[in-house]
Structures are given as structure tokens and as C-alpha cells.
UniProtKB/Swiss-Prot annotation:
Cofactor: Mg(2+)
The entry's keywords: Aminoacyl-tRNA synthetase, ATP-binding, Cytoplasm, Ligase, Magnesium, Metal-binding, Nucleotide-binding, Protein biosynthesis
Disulfide links within the chain: none
Textual note on the cofactor: Binds 2 magnesium ions per tetramer.
GO molecular function: ATP binding; magnesium ion binding; phenylalanine-tRNA ligase activity; tRNA binding
NCBIfam families referenced in this protein's UniProt entry, alphabetically: pheS
A Pfam family recorded for this sequence: tRNA-synt_2d
InterPro entries from the UniProt entry: aa-tRNA-synth_II, aa-tRNA-synth_II/BPL/LPL, Phe-tRNA-synth_IIc_asu, Phe-tRNA_ligase_II_N, Phe_tRNA_ligase_alpha1_bac, Phenylalanyl-tRNA_Synthase, tRNA-bd_arm
EC identifiers of the protein: 6.1.1.20
Protein family (similarity comment): Belongs to the class-II aminoacyl-tRNA synthetase family. Phe-tRNA synthetase alpha subunit type 1 subfamily.
Protein name: Phenylalanine--tRNA ligase alpha subunit
GO cellular component labels: cytoplasm
């Protein structure tokens, strides 16, 4: 047994490759191996013989197993050293560019709006996109005969058993209603989000993004509204030469109401917000609607209109993005074209800040 042990260990130590070592393992410890055959003889031995020979055979198997493991580790280590000696890594080579996503212009503009109005003391409020008829129309002083309630302009859901009409909200004004009903004045919020109307062309889509603002407090008047809008538009377009014009208009939920125009100039064939609209290359462009919150709307929310007044405004986020960043077709916003997104998208770390410029 001692001779067999020495021969096996010597053969293992002299194995030059992993393949040679595996052949030795199979020849000694495999199903038909020499040591396996010795283990099988234990069953035919007498108890005295088994007691004398068993420990020797088991010791031989353990010694061979350990020697094979040690030699395998040695050969693998040598192979690794040899491979590393032939491989080099050129640290001066440029790294392959990884795939990067981009922030959609609508999401970027939403962040810009939140940053600007947060500096003015406004909070961001949200609400459900599936609304009931009362929050979307009735509470906002929109009569049953108003065209906005028509099926061709609003997406309605099938009638419910309780008779309540459900629809996809046509504006984010219901967020204002819910806020006035659940929070105590004074209130300063903006309500950005998705809205839905049955319309589709180069400047309209069935789903679009809108932001509305609401201020409720004592002694609020049109001067507060005009200052807020001027401050917002100047910060958003990052120009101090912004000129606004308020034109009398009509909205059921505000009284008085005003359409807000902004002055622009033509530069290289494109309209650029800012500058003197009275100049030969200038003009006016409507960008949002606004007005003092109608007393009936305030009363519908459980507040006393004799004590509380407020103003509201609203505009399309997609339209703001088009005016600021030069997109021509609103439908491209939702086509999912990677070329368009790479061109107009923003880097993930390009976070809007007032100190660095909201459009930086």
C-alpha cells in the first residue's frame, strides 16, 4: 500500500497539464479506478482484515484526493499567470460610449415651472385625471349648455349606475377646486399635468400638458396677477425685456377675465419671445388665459367670496416648450422618435435652477 501511495502521489506531482491530472483522477478515483477497486474489496474481508486494511485504503484515498486538489490549484495558478503575462490593457484607449437616455422637453419644462413658482411661494398640487362632471365643469361655473361639455370636445366614460358622469379632465382646474375644498386659505398652488380634449392637428393633440396657477387670499387684485405673470414669463424665457398685454376676455370661472399676450420679435425667420412688439419686426402672441376667480366658484368650494379673493391662470406646457426651444409640430412630442428626443432632450443632470438658469 505504501508503494501504491508513493507511486500515485509521484504521478500526480509530475502531471504537466490539467488534462493529465484529470486522467490520473479517473484512473485512481473513478468508478473503475485502482483506489475505488481497493475500497470495494473491504466488503469481502473478515472483520480483522477490514480493521487492519480499511484505514490504510481510506488514508490512500484522502492523500490522493488532497494531492490532486493541490496540483490542480497549482496548474490553474500557473495558467492564469501565463495568460496575464500575454495580455495588456491600454488605459489610453477611449471608452466605448454607453447608451444614455434623455429628459423629455415636457418633463424639463415642468421642472422649470416648479422651480420658478417655488421661488414665488407656490406649491405643486396634483389630482385625478379621471374626473367627475361636478369638479370639471359645474363647480367652475361652466353651464350645461357650454360647448366644452359636448361629446365632440370631451372624452366621457359610460354613465355610472349612480348617474354621476365621469370623464377625462379637460383642464387641471379641478385640482384648484379640490385644493380650495380641502385646504384653508391663503392658497398658492400650480397644478401641472395631463389633460384631454378631442382635437388633433399640428398645434393640438388629444392629450396635452397644462399648468394652472391659483392664488386665494384677502385683498387680491389684478395687479397681483399681472406682476406674477410678468415675473414668471421673464424667468421662464430668461429675458428682462418681456412685455405683456392683457386683453379683456371671457371664461366662466373668472371675472374679470383676460387673455395674456407676450411681445415677440422676428430673428432669422423665427419668432423669439421678448423685445419691442411695436418695432417693425415685432408683434404679439397669446400665451395664456387668466382672471380673477369668479365669486361663484369660490362659494362653490365653501369659502366666503366677500372675505376671500383670488386669481387664476393657465397655459399649455407643450406650447411653452415649443416657444422656448423651437419645436414646430406638437405631434412630434408624442411620436417617440429617438432622433427627435436626442436632439431636443436634456441630460439627466441638467436640473433647472434659478441660480444657474432654468433653461441651462
Amino acid at each position: 500500500m505504501t508503494t501504491e501511495n508513493q507511486d500515485a502521489l509521484s504521478e500526480i506531482a509530475s502531471a504537466a497539464t490539467l488534462a493529465d491530472l484529470e486522467a490520473i483522477r479517473v484512473r485512481t478515483l473513478g468508478k473503475s479506478g485502482t483506489i475505488t477497486a481497493l475500497l470495494k474489496t473491504l466488503g469481502a474481508m473478515t472483520p480483522d482484515q477490514r480493521q487492519a486494511e480499511g484505514p490504510k485504503i481510506h488514508a490512500l484515498r484522502e492523500a490522493v484526493t488532497a494531492a490532486i486538489a493541490d496540483r490542480k490549484a497549482s496548474l490553474e495558478g500557473a495558467a492564469l499567470e501565463a495568460r496575464l503575462a500575454t495580455e495588456t490593457l491600454d488605459m489610453s484607449l477611449p471608452v466605448s460610449a454607453g447608451m444614455q437616455g434623455s429628459v423629455h422637453p415636457v418633463a424639463q419644462v415642468m421642472d422649470e415651472l416648479a422651480e420658478i413658482f417655488a421661488d414665488l411661494g407656490f406649491a405643486v398640487a396634483t389630482g385625478p385625471e379621471i374626473e367627475d362632471d361636478w369638479h370639471n365643469f359645474t363647480a367652475l361655473n361652466i353651464p350645461e349648455t357650454h360647448p366644452a361639455r359636448a361629446m365632440h370636445d370631451t372624452f366621457y366614460f359610460p354613465d355610472r349606475e349612480d348617474g354621476k358622469k365621469m370623464l377625462l379632465r379637460t383642464h387641471t382646474s379641478p385640482v384648484q377646486i379640490r385644493t380650495m375644498m380641502t385646504e384653508k386659505p391663503p392658497i398658492r398652488i400650480i397644478a401641472p399635468g395631463r389633460t384631454y380634449r378631442s382635437d388633433s392637428d399640428a398645434t393640438h393633440t388629444p392629450m396635452f400638458h397644462q399648468v394652472e396657477g391659483l392664488v386665494i387670499d384677502r385683498g387680491i387684485h389684478m395687479g397681483h396677477l399681472k406682476w406674477t405673470l410678468e415675473t414668471f414669463v421673464k424667468a421662464f424665457f430668461e429675458r428682462d425685456d418681456i412685455v405683456l398685454r392683457l386683453r379683456p376676455s371671457f371664461f366662466p370661472f373668472t371675472e374679470p377675465s383676460a387673455e395674456v399676450d407676450v411681445g415677440f420679435t422676428w430673428e432669422k425667420g423665427r419668432r423669439v419671445i421678448g423685445g419691442d412688439p411695436a418695432a417693425g419686426n415685432g408683434g404679439w402672441m397669446e400665451i395664456l388665459g387668466s382672471g380673477m376667480v369668479h365669486p361663484r366658484v369660490i362659494a362653490n368650494c365653501g369659502l366666503d367670496p366677500d372675505e376671500w379673493q383670488g386669481f387664476a391662470f393657465g397655459c399649455g406646457i407643450d406650447r411653452l416648450a415649443m416657444l422656448k426651444y423651437g419645436m414646430d409640430d406638437l405631434r412630434a412630442f408624442f411620436d417617440g422618435d429617438l432622433r427627435w428626443l436626442r436632439h431636443y432632450g436634456f441630460a439627466a443632470l441638467d436640473v433647472p435652477t434659478l441660480s444657474g438658469g432654468v433653461g441651462a
